[in-house]
Amino acid sequence: LKQNIYDNDIFYQAYLDLRLNSTGLNDVLEIPAFRSLLPENLTGMRILDLGCGFGQACSRYASQGAAKVIGVDISKKMISRAKQIYRHENIEYVCLPIEDIGFPREEFDLVLSSLAFHYIADLKNVLERILYCLKNNGFLIFSQEHPVATAKQIPDGWCKNENGEKMHWILDDYNDEGIRKQNWLIKDVIKYHRTMSTIMNTLIGCGFKIVKVLEPTPIKEAEIINKDLKNERRRPPFLMIKAQKGQSSTHSCRRERV
């Protein structure tokens, strides 16, 4: 199942409004933490951005000297906006499901993905495809919703008191992997829950070496900007992993060019 909720008009507009608000979790937590995992110097690199969305990150990588940036997203609306707003001679945008990428062998120095992997049903398939098009010793860096956040099988994971105050986060059904339907901007958004060990062991089994793992939480100063962030210190909202392809990694990904 390849889900394309971002071309839903209601969802798209709600998401656009969310991203235009620079005090949300993406801007004050996910993006800074993700950037901390990137190489200091992107000059001359060939970069693949999976789930590129509006293309902001692609534009940033190109402006920092990347020789080529390819942004992939399943959403026609996202790709259209990216082409309009974040054009650059070193950027190419491709409207394609992440699950269907088929770039040439050892094409990229760096493969990046921000908050997209929890929408993917077959993680192993995607990792094999990434491994194939990643150069030896190249890096995969990705973020996703934390397994603690995706485990619940109810729409809202917070247990609240009679006044609606958030008392604690419900952690249940952690080892029951698979589809989750959650209410986020619209009802019944499909995500895929995997345990921490499944995510890491799938990476290792595909031939990656895990270099660094982050479970970022907001700094207290950020709560001044957004008071709701104090609740995000009570459980990890995001998981971020930096993994490296070794010299002896096998290649089982399809070889056709998109």
What is each PLM-predicted segment?
Residues I179, K191-V213:
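Short alpha-helix
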Residues Q144, V148-A151, N183-S197:
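Acceptor-substrate binding/catalytic loop of class I
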Residues L48-L50, F54-D100:
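Class I SAM-dependent methyltransferase SAM/SAH-binding core
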Residues L1-L42, Q56-R60, R81, I141-G178:
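Conserved class I S-adenosyl-L-methionine
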Residues G102-V111:
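A short acidic, Gly/Pro-enriched loop at the edge of an enzyme's catalytic core
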Residues L110-L123:
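A short SAM/SAH-binding and catalytic strip from SAM-dependent methyltransferases
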Residues K124-F139:
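A short glycine-rich, Lys/Arg-flanked "PGG" loop and its adjoining helix->strand segment in the class I
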